[in-house]
Structure formats: structure tokens, C-alpha cells
A protein has these predicted regions:
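Acidic, metal-coordinating helix/loop segments flanking the phosphotransfer/catalytic sites
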Residues: 24, 36-55, 63, 95
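Charged docking surfaces used in two-component/phosphorelay signaling
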Residues: 21-29
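Conserved phosphotransfer microenvironments
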Residues: 59-73
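Non-catalytic signal-transmission and effector/linker regions of two-component phosphorelay proteins
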Residues: 1-11, 17, 24, 41-42, ...
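Two-component signal transduction core modules
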Residues: 56, 105-106
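Conserved dinucleotide-binding and phosphotransfer motif residues
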Residues: 29-30, 78
Length: 134
């Protein structure tokens, strides 16, 4: 996974190796740099060591331990202030009940185009919020 300073960095957190690799392949084909982790704990360690991330894209459920919601709560605010997009195959009604404020959601299964649209939307919202006077 190459890193280019001009390319936005998406951090993908997914316990399914195939899904994680496919997500990175899709994102890289659209011009993003992809970093990834197979667990919330691994993601937190990697983000702490190198916080250069433009969007966090994470599954919600992981076996044991912390969830994607926990990860969103830890990274969507200071010191990281990351835009977060969570994903799950669970019923949307359930997810809406547990989704933290300001965190976007993409229902599984999704197409590469839906993933790209969701990532760009999350990035655009964050830019608008960060613009003074807007």
C-alpha cells in the first residue's frame, strides 16, 4: 500500500481479510491511499503512531473487544477529529440507535461506487465544518 502525500488517506478497519483487502483495492483505484487494520485495537495503535488519516472507514462488529462504535467515539473528536464512516450488514434501524452523532453509515453490501460516494461525502462534510464562517 503506497502512500503519496497528495492522496487522501482512508484507514479501513475490518476483521474480514478479503473485505478489507477489496475495500483498499477499490479505494486505491480511485486515488486514495489505504491503510488498514483487522481490529479496533490494532487500528488505535496504528493511528496513535501515525495520525495522518483523512477518513476512518470501519465495520461495526468485531469478535470480542472493542467495536467500530468505540473506535468512532475515540477518533471522531480531539485529538484526532477524524471523519468516520461505519458499515454493517445489520438492520439500519438498529444501527441508527447506536450510531454516534456526526458519524456516517454505509449499509452492507455496498458497491464500489457507493463506497466512493460515501467516503467523498464524509470528507466534504468535514471540510465544510472546518471552514471558518460556514
Amino acid at each position: 500500500m503506497s502512500q503519496n502525500k497528495d492522496r487522501p488517506v482512508v484507514f479501513v478497519v475490518e476483521d474480514g481479510d478479503g473485505t478489507r483487502q477489496l475495500s483498499c483495492l477499490v479505494l486505491e483505484s480511485y486515488g486514495f491511499t489505504c491503510r488498514s487494520a483487522g481490529s479496533v485495537e490494532e487500528a488505535l495503535t496504528l493511528i496513535e503512531s501515525d495520525p495522518r488519516v483523512d477518513v476512518l472507514f470501519s465495520d461495526i462488529h468485531f469478535p470480542g473487544g472493542l467495536t467500530g462504535v468505540d473506535l468512532a467515539l475515540k477518533t471522531a473528536h480531539a485529538p484526532y477529529n477524524l471523519p468516520v464512516l461505519l458499515t454493517s450488514g445489520l438492520a439500519v434501524e438498529y444501527v441508527e440507535e447506536i450510531l454516534p452523532d456526526g458519524v456516517a453509515f454505509l449499509e452492507k453490501p455496498y458497491t464500489p461506487e457507493q463506497l466512493l460516494t460515501a467516503i467523498r461525502s464524509v470528507m466534504a462534510k468535514r471540510r465544510v465544518l472546518a471552514t471558518p464562517g460556514v
